[in-house]
Amino acid sequence: MDKERISYHESVQKMYERIKKDNMTNVWDRYEAQGIGGVPDRRCTFCMAGARCDLCSNGPCRSDAAKDKRGVCGITADGMAMRMMLLRNVMGASTYHYHTDQTIRTLRETAKGKTPYSIREPEKLRTFAGRLGIETLGSDSEIALYLCEFVEKDFNRPAYEPSRIVEILAPPERKKRWEELDIFPGGIYGEMMLSTSSCLTNVDGYYASLALKAMRLGIAMAYQSQIVNEYCQDILFGIPKPHTMRVDLGVLDPEYVNVLPNGHEPFLGFAMVQLARKPEWQEKAKAAGAKGLRVIASIETGQEMIQRWEEDDAFYGFTGNWISQEAVLASGSVDLFAADMNCSLPVAPLYAEKYGFKLMPVSELIAFEDITERLNYNPVEAGRQAAKLLNMAVENFKNRKNSGEPVLNLPVKEAVVGFSTESILDALGGTLDPLLDAIKSGAIKGVVGMVSCTTLRDYGQDVHSVAVVKELIKRNILVLSLGCGNGAMQVAGLCSPETREFAGDSLKAVCEALGVPPVLSYGTCTDTGRLADFLGAISAVMGVPIPDLPIAAAAPEYMEQKATIDAIFALALGLYTYVNPVPTVTGAPDLVKLLTEDCREVTGGVLNVEKDAVKAVDGIEQHIMEKRKKLGI
């Protein structure tokens, strides 16, 4: 594979050489092997078009819209493609909400004094509870318990009973439109049941109906799962505030005991950092022959952590996003890999055996072949669980050192991380006016929320995302980066002050005046809800509906099921939404037309699909300029 087809990052390119030398299975070779006729991106044409189904025993079926060839049950190509998309959406929503459920569980036990955590942001607790109409006169613990009770009651509302959380948090104009479309949601559990049941054979085969149900589920997910999750994590672990963080694979020093919490849930990661910062744990590592003990942030668990807590010698840095995982594990510097929900590769046991690290599932969702030992997260036991994990890592240090030579001299960069609604307001002096003035004057043409994964489809890891974002800031468009795409920006150096040199003159001047980079590190994919709430605030201050603002969403390298429901929610919110790779719906012409054209008249949002980075940004910029013209700015 060419270097650019492997990754944008030199560190990962170098580690690929090590992996190949060691004859290890890896994501790049596996991707190439899936290609047809020696072309990595060429796959089954029916699968790529979304025109196939294997849900019942009459199948598998293939469909062809041009010939009106339907499934045995009679479903059209459009119905097939949208039904499978909705099932992906359900998986994404369910996984997002599993995280939320664990966060509420953790907040409740913390309020009872049973965890190693504390309520770090009592003001945020009271502000958020107050927004939801919860009594705020009691103690922090009492309010936290009221909050847990309130949100769980809302989660459990049936689909036919409107969600109070959505009613309170969503912008009035959006609520009105959703009610008109009959997509105002009930509780998230009821919505998941409604969507899943609709996908049964011979139930709902109408693509437009299925698309509306997907939007309804997306709205429930964003406001109930994502916003509640992130705001409650803020309450527990701190509101993100800007600070520098070491990033890239060079944060792994083989002379230290290195512990990597990996996945999407940061609970045990935070607990381990609290312990690792204590002198006695550093002494334990030194007694084992190491220079010390470090917790290294990885993927979205790591992203949750680095947004909130500052670096030091115990909480040392961040490796990268999910495609970097095998590169990290093959570095010869990992002692323990704690795998929570999401983004832990099934091949990890092979790497653990080869490179001598301890692989430990810490979520009931995660399982690996031939790995029998596990430590499922329990907030009441979190302190003891974190200590056990650190002990495992220390005890494994000598085994890892004897398992082969580590890779040295990998790069380390610095990124500015930790932007949130609150910290952006702080940077602006407590009001949105400076940002809005910059937009009105044209110094900032518009804002793009880049919520993305990373994928090998069409390009190497992060290559397309970096190209799109560089082109956006060159055209004076401010970028808020989220998800694995945020990790891409950090490791690529685009979240540092030096990035201003890539920005257009007017955006560069604004960023210099505010002391920020033109790419603001805004969190994980779960922060999509936080971003929606921020856009709602901008809409309220400007008195302009969200669909009429000079803003857009972009997912240059979406990959999995969470990403699909983020995109569907963006359409429901009324956003111009750019995605790549091409979704598996091209064999569904009516569905394609609905998403890429007709949706403008439905919600105000529209989907744009484009492989070329410059053409993609052309479309985004054209949309932004049309909105500016309509607003007279």
UniProtKB/Swiss-Prot annotation:
Q: Which domain of life is it from?
A: Archaea
Recorded GO molecular functions are: 4 iron, 4 sulfur cluster binding; anaerobic carbon-monoxide dehydrogenase activity; hydroxylamine reductase activity; nickel cation binding; peroxidase activity
The record's Gene Ontology biological-process terms are: generation of precursor metabolites and energy; nitric oxide catabolic process; response to hydrogen peroxide
InterPro entries to which the protein is assigned, alphabetical: CO_DH_a-bundle (IPR016101), CODH (IPR010047), HCP/CODH (IPR004137), Prismane-like_a/b-sand (IPR016099), Prismane-like_sf (IPR011254)
Signal sequence region: none
Annotated positions binding [4Fe-4S] cluster 1: C44
User: Which cysteine pairs are covalently linked by disulfides here?
Assistant: none
Give the EC number(s) under which this enzyme is classified.
1.2.7.4
Q: Which keywords describe this protein according to UniProt?
A: 4Fe-4S, Iron, Iron-sulfur, Metal-binding, Nickel, Oxidoreductase
Return the broad EC class. Answer: oxidoreductase
Protein's UniProt keywords contain Methyltransferase:
no
Task: List the Pfam families hit by this protein, alphabetically.
Answer: Prismane
Q: So where does [Ni-4Fe-5S] cluster get bound?
A: H264, C343, C453, C484, C525
Cofactor needs = [4Fe-4S] cluster; [Ni-4Fe-5S] cluster
Q: Which residues form a coiled coil?
A: none
The record's comment on cofactor binding reads: Binds 3 [4Fe-4S] clusters per homodimer. Binds 2 [Ni-4Fe-5S] clusters per homodimer.
Which sites bind [4Fe-4S] cluster 2?
Answer: C53, C56, C61, C73
Reaction it catalyzes: CO + 2 oxidized [2Fe-2S]-[ferredoxin] + H2O = 2 reduced [2Fe-2S]-[ferredoxin] + CO2 + 2 H(+)
Question: According to its UniProt entry, what is the function of this protein?
Answer: CODH oxidizes carbon monoxide coupled, via CooF, to the reduction of a hydrogen cation by a hydrogenase (possibly CooH).
Q: What family does the entry list?
A: Belongs to the Ni-containing carbon monoxide dehydrogenase family.
Domain observations: Cluster B is an all-cysteinyl-liganded 4Fe-4S cluster; cluster C is a mixed Ni-Fe-S cluster which is the active site of CO oxidation. Cluster D is also an all-cysteinyl-liganded 4Fe-4S cluster that bridges the two subunits of the CODH dimer.
Q: How does it assemble?
A: Homodimer.
Stated name of the protein: Carbon monoxide dehydrogenase 2
